[in-house]
């Protein structure tokens, strides 16, 4: 009788420790607080004169960007399949020009009970900072209603041989051309047009042109 009792006690302690560790490392606050700090930092950038995309008059009246509430269900792990032929796409830009991007891989995942797929891109003429990140321009059913009509972007850190990638739609952002027509931005290609709404990330800025 002693041994089973000890095993039960040990199992109980292990279970308590598991939930403690899970709560410590995976609770919402550990994710949401840094996300909100990032958003505040971006607001500061938009208010500043150096790196803000806003025209001077809009910048002087700027208060903050508008976002959906953080939603952990829209931070998804996707399976990555590198494309055997990584061809170059001349992605259309908002001014009618094109910019070269490498079709690097596809990411498959499930949202709202439906299978989804996005193509992950690398800019051909990329900077050192862009070397280990992938670019994901996409559209969804919120565009033109609650989010910028031209789509939104994700920048994703990525390791060369990774089999999965996290698509954190809470970090989806509007391109600079959503705030100022003087900027030129990529237009999300056909294969990245989602058939569902992604109510996460940056919303339409009411002070935009």
What is each model feature region?
Residues 2-5, 29, 173-209:
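Extended, aromatic/histidine-rich regions of cofactor-dependent oxidoreductases associated
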Residues 6-23:
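Hydrophobic membrane-insertion alpha-helices, especially the h-region
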Residues 24-39:
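Ser/Thr/Pro/Gly-rich low-complexity linker/stalk segments immediately outside membranes or between
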Residues 33, 40-44, 48-49:
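Contiguous hydrophobic, core-forming segments of folded domains
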Residues 38, 53-97:
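Extracytoplasmic/periplasmic/luminal assembly and interaction segments
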Residues 80, 120-124, 140-142, 169-173, ...:
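A mature extracytoplasmic/lumenal domain signature
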Residues 84-150:
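Mid-length scaffold segments of soluble, non-membrane domains
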Residues 137-164, 168-173:
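Acidic, glycine-rich flexible loop segments
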